[in-house]
């Protein structure tokens, strides 16, 4: 933790806003550049603008963080090094990252730049933080859904610097777990192009249209003391696509209350609300898992009824000492803090007529114009009978200020970047390569996998001999009897020569983690193949609590590029699942050693802490499906996972790629998975009989931008 209580982190969509939020009191600013940012439709910064922004901020003791918080394709990864290098050399303070491959590359090639993991990484627990710390991560941006109590525990257990969202728009889905916009229209949130389908109306179980997936804006200004007690260091304001007046106004109020430590007045709270909100404010996630009062229910227009005046540009105070003596070089020494610079001109000559007036000379030096500086005091030592032309005084001032500016900025500059040879980042461990080669030479050169979430599905699937591997969902089992029930299923399946993996939940919050740790020793004794993991918490736990168990990454542990895949496999992972947003061409050009492909299944569009069941019918803690219907009359199943307390919203149609298995084999894929989630036994039979009436190809043909 840093010395100060908080860092106030503000958004900036352009250079004008960056300067405005800094003048309004931001300690740090996050921006997007021309590539790899999660706001692809924002103006974003050109290279020239971003370099100017870095200098402007550093002169004022403010940090600049660059968003590289999207998933990067293989075809793009080679551009990353050159893109970052110019900013790294200039002193960029940190990069905010989603892709584990980008984390690996930055840690390798840009050793003195901080790495902040994005909320897109969906980190919800201490074990996720522990895993990421192995890659040189210096700060973790917590998932917005994580409570203050959870943050406090994470900070106490790991000591990691934590960043939390404090103000602005809330996604309905856990960030990084949303494919809604991607699947419906090809605009991927993982690529910075979300079309915000959560802000549209839906019919729930035949009732009138409601904005059931739209959350109110976050406002945590009344919880500053509690955020401090929880160990949060950086307070993040959302809004890189917001206007200058909004950004500056919000920063101004947060700055005031951070510094004063006073309770927030009702009048100021209303003024903040007037700057902009969607149907009011909420800070519910800080204290509760979810709540119906967080939802807008009505059309979530962003309403702004007030504009704070733009802050005036404040100049930086410097001291000066002017020395003009006959026969000696004229000098102007300027100082800011502990940094000084001395500029010189030609030796001063004697006056032939009127000598130089001391006040006139000081006034001339004081004319700093449109520079960033102004003199607080100028000490002058001027001979009695000397003359210096105005042009020479102007040059002396310009050279002094320019030299001081360069010297102030030079301490941020870096020259320690390592040469990038990306091929060295993509290698897989030798045992993985050998295993794949052995698999390739086998008579049966591919594996068929099924995953199931219910007992009825398992009872149906066990009768099909075509499946070599079964993924059994963690939440099929009652917690009190999990070990015994799972052991029975493993024994039953292994008698049929089937391999078994335990498929862990999409979200693994503290309660789930504690339970998992408590059963780990007994679970490790069960003779099953390993785990399918869906988050960084599970990856760390399975890596450290079990011996001889394989770990497979599910599709949402994104291996969009070969560097990401290598990063995971170096930490003991045995296999990965091809990300759902890659198209056939991209799949052909990735390293598919150890990869499996989902060739059937309803794609999950959202994983959410808020519960559609609870918010429409009340919470009865009974798992069942209800359906959302959109304006095109498409129905989306919502499944409530009550043990882990999250919802999954599924696509209206299943994706079916079984006819493409031959092509996928050519791409080097050897394992093919049928992912059963919401299907009844009758629907499973239709899948196995190749009689699915309606289905989609997902992103196999089109992909995402």
Positions of the model-derived regions?
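Hydrophobic alpha-helical bundles that form the membrane domains of multi-pass transporters
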Residues: 135-136
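Active-site pocket-lining/capping segments in soluble small-molecule metabolic enzymes
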Residues: 2-123, 141-145, 149-234, 241-705
